[in-house]
Amino acid sequence: MKKVILSALFLAALPSVVQAQEEENTPENSFTLSAQLRPRFEYRNGAYVPLQEGEKPAILVNNRTRLNLDYHHGDQLQLFVSLQNVNIWGQAPQVQLNDRTGGLSVFEAYAALPIYEDLNIKIGRQMIILDEDRIFGSLDWHPAGRAHDAININWKNDKLTLRSFFAFNQNYFDGNASSVNGNVNNPKGQYFYIAPGTQPYQHLEAVHAHYDFAPTQGLSFLVANLGQRNSSNNDIDYNMQTIGLHYRGKSDALRYGAEAYLQTGKNVAGKDKEAFLLAALVDYQFTPAFSATLGLDYLSGNDTNDPTATKDKAFNPFSGTNHKFYGFMDHFYVSYSPSVGLLNPYLNLTLKTSDKGNLSATGHYFRSAGKIVGDKDNKTRHLGVEGDLVYTHKIQQYVSLQAGYSLFVPSSAYNKLRDLHNVRKQQDWLWCSLNINPKLFSAKF
């Protein structure tokens, strides 16, 4: 009888023992290795800067190579590192004794860990992407992308997400030398220098809140402070504040949105800042295969040749993915930031050509926000028109193809602003890109 009772107790306890063993053997760690190879052919016949008569177009293939290492220890720690090489085909010789491409760089390298319940922190080099890239974006179109050295503290519940960002940048300028000294052991003061290719700010403080007050309705609020210094007054901090709202909504086949941002404080030269950005769009899905978007962007600007102006009214989308908004040929807020601002009405038509492909066409009309004095054809605010055509096709799970053609017709006022002469009437750009993103290895242990 005792044996029967013991056997029954053992069988009853067995599932609990097995479950406990399974819980003990549940992997706490995971590791994923992924990669990206993205070559892009470009025929630049006026991209970035309009070509003048007699100038030849640029023909090249640029390439991005990334290797991503993503480690998780349960929900207690994430460590992410993205190594990157950016080059032009032919930049490195066939027999490569020295790496002329600049070698490997670290695109992202951060650790993320919980602080308390719904509060977590991410520290290190990381992308900052907010509200469809208008003010903070990844700049993914550029072969190198954009990342910040920063601390990111997040809190989230069902409907509300709070994100904060803090950064302090430092580089050392060698007195009369023309380059930044990368020596981390430099004992001299703190001389921060802003120059092309270096950091656009010394310190950054930003808070972003997003609230979903309905499943298809969301509102965001951003306040950001940019601490700037220039080489002439390096002991003085010029702080510029950006404050704004971003709204997106959807109802059946209709999608709509609006955003507004105000900039105040000082610009990098120490001049008072008083600028704003307004944007709105409406998108309608006519059929499962066809949609249209009508939108308008307005970035305030200054009048030209106004000696009485005491304030800088030019809005600065300092870390936005501006390629996405103001024309794919990058004539506005990429290669050139117009002090006169920009009015940009646009129309986008998107056609789904197959289960794996779609075709998109966008037309832009560019006009200055501020007055342009001395334009010979008296169209004192007309800056030009642009058309962008893009075809996307997913070849397989990890491979996609993109190709595009853009045409830009600058006005005489635009050429005058950029001090360009004898400019061709039409500028165009042709490109084709292959994006390969395989997951190479994944394991739990």
Segments the model singles out, each with a brief description of its role:
Residues 117-121, 139-308, 347, 352, ...:
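Signature for the C-terminal beta-barrel architecture of outer-membrane proteins
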Residues 40-48, 88-94, 126-139, 167-173, ...:
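Sequence/structural signature of outer-membrane beta-barrel proteins
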Residues 1-26, 439-445:
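Cleavable N-terminal export/targeting peptides
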Residues 298-387:
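C-terminal structural cap/anchor segments
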Residues 49-63, 73-116, 130-139, 266-273, ...:
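Surface-exposed loop and membrane-interface regions of Gram-negative outer-membrane beta-barrel proteins
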Residues 23-48, 75-81, 217:
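Transmembrane beta-strand segments of Gram-negative outer membrane beta-barrel proteins
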Residues 424-445:
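Outer-membrane beta-barrel "beta-signal"
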Residues 56-58, 196-198, 249, 271, ...:
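Extracellular/periplasm-exposed beta-strand and loop segments of Gram-negative cell-envelope proteins
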